[in-house]
């Protein structure tokens, strides 16, 4: 018991305001600890750290509202995190943690320069983006960090991507390009725009979107 108390006290950071929840999440005054458990991917963790204004390793409720758009670019040059842009050669291992950004409305995952066939989108992309209204996957676009790369029709490959969207998500617009889909299940009254271009879809898939306004399958 004495050892347990010491371990808990060791987690009481920032003037004793942080507590350890039953699920291991570090929280302080409705804040979220910036750690490997809450943000498993180091690059997503860097994004969180950039919005930690007072550098206390905790995202408070106001800091959680600062990120509104996240861009992930697959590239082999000038990798790193800058602002709301992740430029990575290794992809994202997990999107866990982005659910804490309450005002995050748009996520784009794409490529710049020469695509890598080994690149793979984290399978939990849709699991942790329930608050996001616009999701774009595998789009080539002008790199906001490196101006040498311009918008083009190039596609990168993403294998075994599972797409599951239901009414628990806020997603209104989904755009896919050049994706090999292992599973697709879209059942949503909120979905208004669905664009699926040059994708390899599974033999069986479900799309039930009664309020859809725009559909593009080619």
Residues covered by each model-derived region:
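N-terminal capping/linker segments that flank leucine-rich repeat
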Residues: 2-4, 22-162, 167-182, 190-192, ...
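Hydrophobic alpha-helical segments and their boundary regions
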Residues: 4-5, 11
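Intrinsically disordered, low-complexity repeat segments enriched in small/polar residues
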Residues: 9-10, 28
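Bacterial N-terminal signal peptides
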Residues: 10-20
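Alpha-helical polar/charged "hotspots" used for coordination or helix-helix interfaces
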Residues: 203
């Amino acid at each position: 018991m004495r050892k347990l108390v010491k371990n808990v006290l060791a987690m009481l950071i920032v003037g004793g305001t942080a507590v350890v929840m039953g699920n291991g999440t570090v929280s302080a005054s409705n804040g979220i600890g910036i750690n490997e458990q809450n943000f498993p991917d180091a690059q997503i963790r860097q994004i969180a750290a950039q919005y930690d204004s007072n550098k206390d390793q905790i995202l408070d409720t106001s800091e959680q509202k600062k990120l509104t758009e996240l861009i992930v670019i697959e590239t082999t040059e000038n990798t790193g995190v800058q602002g709301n842009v992740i430029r990575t050669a290794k992809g994202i291992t997990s999107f866990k943690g982005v659910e804490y950004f309450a005002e995050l409305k748009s996520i784009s995952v794409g490529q710049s320069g020469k695509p890598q066939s080994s690149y793979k989108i984290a399978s939990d992309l849709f699991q942790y983006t329930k608050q996001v209204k616009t999701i774009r996957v595998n789009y080539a676009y002008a790199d906001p960090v490196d101006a040498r790369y311009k918008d083009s029709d190039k596609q990168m490959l993403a294998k075994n991507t599972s797409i599951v969207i239901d009414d628990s998500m806020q997603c209104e617009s989904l755009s896919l390009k050049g994706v090999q889909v292992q599973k697709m299940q879209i059942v949503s009254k909120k979905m208004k725009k669905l664009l699926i271009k040059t994708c390899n879809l599974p033999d069986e898939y479900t799309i039930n979107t009664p309020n859809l306004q725009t559909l593009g399958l080619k």
